[in-house]
Amino acid sequence: MQIIRLLNGKVVAEDVSPVFDMQCQVLCVGAGCAGTYAADAAARNGAKVILLENDITIGGMHILGNVRGYYYGFEGGSFEEDDQAAQEANVFYHKADQKRVFLLRRLQKSGVNLYCGYTPTALLVDGNRVRGVLAFDGEKEIVIRADVTIDATSDGFLIRMLPVEKSYGRSRGGQMAPFSVFSTFFDGEKYRMVNRDAGYIDPYDCRDFSRKTMHAHRQASNLVRERQMLNLASHTGVREGLRFQGEEMLRYEDVLLGRTPEKVLFWAYSDLDVHGHLRALDDELFQTWWVVSNLATAAIRIPVPMGAVVPKGWRGIVTAGRCLSADSYMQNAVRMVRDMFRMGECVGTAAAIAALEHEDFRNIDYSRYLEKVKRAGCYAGDESKEVGFDFPKKNRPYQPIVFDFDKTFPLLRTETPGVAIWSAFNCKSQASAADRLAVLLDETDSLCRYNAAIALGVMGDQRALPVLRELLQNRDCFYFKDCRRSNQFRSVIAVCLLGRIGEPCDIPFLSEIVFNEKEFSKEMYHTLEPDYLYYKGSDRNFLYFDMVTHGGAALVKIHHRFGLATEKLKLAFIRLLEEGKLEKRIAPRCLAEDAPREEARQFLGEMIRSTDVNGKRNEGKA
């Protein structure tokens, strides 16, 4: 056997003849949202289970990170029993303490052996099979043998030790989602929670993590001047971390286009919950959904493949939580608290079957697995909700969405054309749909004409170009109304589409938007006050930020598509970065380390890399 561990960021291995201090059938590392229910489910299904937690208590971000409310994620499963019990209890002032009590009772009842204050230090492997872990208990390193090991550390602490391909952040730029520090306060009437984006953080860089966390705490503590602060979360809210190459991969394009894997581990439920505002660097298909079709808050059932929790080529180890084999967009979606509870319960159930039957995780009796998780209620969620506008506060009824070009065509005459635009994009009869849209380009109603041009443009039809150019010449701050938040501006969408189907003659106009300081003085950028419908923050000029970033990305695309020299364009972006004027116009009241100015620098840095003939895209690799 060998032990493999990380030393200075590198995987190293050494031969050993281990003496086991503890043995179990299922070992779960991490007692957060997923790990707690994974351990409990494995024990209830007959396995001998050990649960290790690095911290002094359990609950993870749900308890220690103040993430106690629910956003999306399906109901169903064991967590509902604990929620109900905690709701009815009146023992503690702090709800998190109540929930923790019932989590501990659950583990005790199912027979899980819980060890807090244990830090995993190495993996024990035999060939391509993980046989357990080494952990430090504060005094010595102990060896634990297990038939199945579950990495429920959220950031893939164990997966990082494996020689598998790993990555983080989006494919272009490698940037991860912004982090938050959750704070609770009393505003004179109610106790409330705030979780505003606090900038970008590298969770694997100790110096960056410490510096950014302290800055975020300093910002949050300003609430003391206005309200009665109760507490700041002891855990930093990192939304995105390590991903790995698994036996299967969860891809956002498969979800958006309705492809389902043969064996589904469980069904998650969320909108494509991407934080941050630099949509100009997103993948084109994602932009089509989120920006052009204005479907930011459309919630989707997400089928997570069984193989997405299994590192490629390895046996005896799986993950539970947001560290999985997925792209950045899916990792951001499959992280809702309720879904983490349910995912943990499903993984724990499958792990117990694998351990007791001496079978690999992916080769267990799938029908038996389905029977167990469906009976427990943690597998499918509400099967009537495929895709639709859902409202987490339940203050409005669920609105199902059907993508049918003929049925949604009338929406192009309204302020809510998003479903019709995506239906046109994904229509099987592209030619006939495009011809119907082209007829609308002659409409006298500018709303209908502009909507039709956007739908035609997203299909790649250049007949949309004259109207898109007209839209931009008359650019304004009109925004679509499909969503309860994050609605997109029509002018921004037109700029985005020019990048896809525009021509060299569009370069001067786009350059004026990006590089001419007089652009910022236009009335459209100083008309709207912050609003939850499109952008609720006062930390930046949100419309100008979107126009400039999408304009810059469009310029680069046109240059590349037509094989134009990019040296002058690169120098123009370099000047913007060095002068710092752009980030000051975007966010004049922010510090350099705050999210808006940081995003402006990220944008310019990626534009410079994209125009460098010798440069390569900065894809996040771990």
Question: How does the language model describe each region?
Answer:
Residues 3-9, 17, 61, 85, ...:
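Flavin (FAD/FMN)-binding glycine-rich loop and adjacent Rossmann-like elements that form
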Residues 30-33:
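Glycine-rich Rossmann-fold phosphate-binding loop(s) that bind the pyrophosphate
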Residues 89-90, 383-426, 436:
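C-terminal domain-closing interface element
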Residues 415-430, 435, 439-442, 447-462, ...:
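Structural detector for internal amphipathic alpha-helices that build alpha-solenoid repeat scaffolds
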